[in-house]
Amino acid sequence: MNNTEFHELVDEKLQLLEDMIDDSGADIEPVITGNVLTLEFENRSQIVINKQEPMHEIWLASKSGGFHFSYVDEKWTCSKTGMEFIEMVKEECQKHADEEIEWV
């Protein structure tokens, strides 16, 4: 994939994530600065998601540590856990929010 395709794929996934957060009603504030999406929680904890263009990866940093996602078989998969990106973000959001989140 070239850089343009990479950015299109990541932007599409991040927009989906923002929409899911909005639809959930959870107290999570998404803040975008350049290639970084920070999810800010009421308890002041954060999840940081950024695009790593040179490696064509999405990186996620949370309470659980750092994770790298590569685009394989038309989905973003974690190199450490094998989890799909959105599923891992949902799991990490639950940990940071300290409450059950109703994902739509």
UniProtKB/Swiss-Prot annotation:
It holds the Pfam family Frataxin_Cyay. It comes from the Bacteria. One of its GO terms (cellular component) is cytosol. Keywords: Iron, Metal-binding. GO terms for biological process: iron-sulfur cluster assembly. InterPro entries: CyaY, Frataxin/CyaY, Frataxin/CyaY_sf, Frataxin_CS. GO terms for molecular function: ferric iron binding; ferrous iron binding. HAMAP family: CyaY. Involved in iron-sulfur (Fe-S) cluster assembly. May act as a regulator of Fe-S biogenesis. Belongs to the frataxin family. This is Iron-sulfur cluster assembly protein CyaY. It comes from Aliivibrio fischeri (strain MJ11). The lineage of its organism: Bacteria, Pseudomonadati, Pseudomonadota, Gammaproteobacteria, Vibrionales.
